[in-house]
Swiss-Prot record:
GO terms for biological process: ribosome biogenesis. This is GTPase Der. GTP 1 binds at residues 8-15, 55-59, 119-122. Gene3D superfamilies: 3.30.300.20, P-loop containing nucleotide triphosphate hydrolases. It holds the Pfam family KH_dom-like. The gene is der. It comes from Ureaplasma parvum serovar 3 (strain ATCC 700970). HAMAP family: GTPase_Der. GTPase that plays an essential role in the late steps of ribosome biogenesis. GTP 2 binds at residues 181-188, 228-232, 293-296. GO terms for molecular function: GTP binding; ribosome binding. InterPro entries: G_ENGA, GTP-bd, GTPase_Der, KH_dom-like, KH_dom-like_a/b, P-loop_NTPase, Small_GTP-bd. Associates with the 50S ribosomal subunit. Belongs to the TRAFAC class TrmE-Era-EngA-EngB-Septin-like GTPase superfamily. EngA (Der) GTPase family.
Amino acid sequence: MRTIAIVGKPNVGKSSLFNRILMRRKSIVDDQPGVTRDRIYDIGNWLTRSFMLIDTGGIISSKDTYQDNINEQVLFAINEANTIIFLVSAKDGINNDDKKIAKMLKEKAKDKKIILVINKIESEKYYLNEGELYSFGFGKFFKISAEHGIGMGDLLDELVKDMPIQNNLEKQERFKFCIIGRPNVGKSSLTNTILGEQRVIVNAEAGSTRDSIDNDFNYYNKKYTIIDTAGIRRKGKIVESVEKYAVLRTKKAIERSQLILLVLDGSEPFKEQDEVVGGLAYNANIPTIIIVNKWDNIINKNSHTMEMVKKQIRSQFKYLSWAPIVFVSALDNKRIHTIFEAIEFVREQAMRKIATSLLNDVVIKANAFQEPPPFKGGRISISYIVQVQSQIPTFVLKCNNPKFLHFSYARYIENEIRKAFGFDSVPITLYWQDKNKKLRGE
């Protein structure tokens, strides 16, 4: 699949163009320069052609904490790309930063296709000299308005004209999981270690990752997509509009995932924010693995330390009692393999299908062995159970009247199912239904 990178100085509309090509809001857009810090990836489609699109941070000469990292990210993107969109702004005109980028592209991307694109032509005033644009040496250029969609058809035709027709089946085959956690627990370091490269900017300042980033990779011939997300802070501390949108992005990333890696910082006491983020994982009702990061930073460890930390986690995160716990040191690349062992272990449980006859044998016996308590004027009696298709093990239980069900008895039946069929590391869902009501498809 061909790769296209969008580069340019800050605030020329790179993220707006990225979103326009994808026809959805993937990159954060704000009139504040420097909003995009990392490389953002997604697959675009035009005229039955598929391509990987990369949004990058703005290149400038600056003493900003992140600027050297941003410039490095852009160079990574240029190296990955087959085609580069060099974006400038009709509204702001050409300045020294544009000229430096043009010079850099001639040096670093001399063997690649470079398309000069003039954005923001909806502006009433132009500050561009076309002779100056031709002097860059990139030949024909395209005038567009990413915000309003003007000129996009011609640009997209140019981008895909030499591309082969490609489908998107590979993307669909990948197992997708996301990394979540409060800021500065090491989510980006973990992503970088897994991917084996510096794809996500890592900085000691909490909140240095603002976008969620899809990264495709293979691990021992298995295909994965990992989503690195913005760290979630307590709502009262989020003041920037961009940060608010990043929190929403994290929640959306969870919705797109098949599994969650909840990262905790093992080198310090767990915080209230950790429990808040854990609540998001619980509410998502999908498989979750708890990752205790920075394990090597814990001093004076002994043979009992790991078990003590596990007990502490089980106490603070009671609602994730089924989630496996893995201990790693992302920066030192230690015990990373245990994450994938846990992922595959959990995947197998989540996909496990139980024969209806076996289910009924276990549940009907459990119902007879422990008589349910009377509740709301009646007593529950289970007639039948069947597993239904879902992302996690999900069961429909037919009974005489669901209103007679007490939560403690529902928990008893759930535990019996877990024990009998080995569902000890995934969430499971039970739906209690009146036996006279038909299931869809019956």
